[in-house]
Amino acid sequence: TGIKAKFVFMDMFLQDNLSDLVRNMGFSDEDIIWLYSYFTDLKIAPTTYTVKDLEKEIPYDITRREINGKVVKLFCTKEDIFYAAYLRKEGEDIVHRVEKVSRGCLIRKDFYSYTKMFTEYYTPVDNKAHLYQRRFFNEDGSIAYDEIVDGKDSVFRFPDKILSSKQEFIAYFM
């Protein structure tokens, strides 16, 4: 008794905020360690990023808005870009992730909690979006580390270290 348990999650969570998931399972944010945020100074926390926050960050004129269920699309016609904001719940203003599509091609996904947690970068290959990099951030927006993705293989690049596989990444965590 008296020993505080921590639960370590080692998978990527792309569809939902980890805080929302673990709270639904009865855990508190403080009980959780996420492998990918462990090397940042971010806390496990609910999403508070809003569509208005996104609108302030878009450097182009937003010429059209579409709302379809949990997705809000913001179009910048002159630049041939649109942003698809995926809401935590339909009818809310809280954004879990944003996809940036340029000239019909997905080029970036940004994932949020109380700040931007990480970004995925894509390039078109055979008319499909191909993930080639994830960048993980600290609270102040500085880069904590990068994951360079090549299919199922990854290389993790830290300011002072390069880890050549997910196994090395997990071993470094341990």
Give the role of each language-model region.
Residues 56-167:
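Repetitive, compositionally biased segments used for assembly/scaffolding
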Residues 1-46, 53-55, 131-174:
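Long terminal segments
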